[in-house]
Amino acid sequence: MSVTMREMLEAGVHFGHQTRFWNPKMAPFIFGHRNKIHIINLEKSLPMFQEAQKFAKQLTANRGTILMVGTKRQARELLAAEAQRAGVPYVDQRWLGGMLTNFKTVKTSIKRLKDMKAQQEAGLESMSKKEQLTFTREIEKLEKDIGGIQDMNALPDAIFIIDVGFHKIAVAEAKKLGIPLIGVVDSNHSPEGIDYVIPGNDDSAKAVALYARGIADAIIEGRANAVNDVVKAAAPEGSDEFVEVEESAA
């Protein structure tokens, strides 16, 4: 789960935006500038990223759900792959307005998608070719819009966002509902309202991969801890001796 300073350097996490586009509220996290590009202070970014990982791990250990969001071109595939690896919901194409604040309607769309997929698996022979084409196109659209959240039965307990400025609608919805935010904040955006700020480059594919992998690792580790706690709670007295017998039998 641990991320090192060297990994951050190699991923280009320290490269911010052009100095003329900076947000003064990011001043505490900026080391300086080079060739009119702000340099983000990794001595601050690293512990803040680790704090975000710790939060993600603890939340998941307590059976909380984290929604991962990254719809920028360079983030889509990377984020979707890591979310799938961690077994959590994700949004990788576009954020639909009301995805959180109007979740009741979104759940209706999710049910529609699941029903249509079940119908597709059963066979569409009773439909005309034109009807099949229309049906398939609707499924494809629903998959693109909400496929990553089709197993999310309730609002998430936290949201991880790559580029809070690009996803300002998602940020606003989360804040309105009081859902904690883990956010990658570049030098041109404001960290205000983000519960766990990760100051860093939000454009580099390598940096995006690092953030997504780090949070996914924390989620997986947290879930493993939750499973271990359940096993320990269910184990009868004298279970240590029982485990030793199992090991010797193996």
From Swiss-Prot:
This is Small ribosomal subunit protein uS2. InterPro entries: Ribosomal_uS2, Ribosomal_uS2_bac/mit/plastid, Ribosomal_uS2_CS, Ribosomal_uS2_flav_dom_sf. Belongs to the universal ribosomal protein uS2 family. GO terms for cellular component: cytosolic small ribosomal subunit. GO terms for molecular function: structural constituent of ribosome. Keywords: Ribonucleoprotein, Ribosomal protein. GO terms for biological process: translation. The gene is rpsB. PANTHER family: 30S RIBOSOMAL PROTEIN S2 PROKARYOTIC AND ORGANELLAR (PTHR12534), SMALL RIBOSOMAL SUBUNIT PROTEIN US2M (PTHR12534:SF0). Pfam families: Ribosomal_S2. It comes from the Bacteria. HAMAP family: Ribosomal_uS2_B (MF_00291_B). NCBIfam families: rpsB_bact. SUPFAM superfamilies: Ribosomal protein S2 (SSF52313).
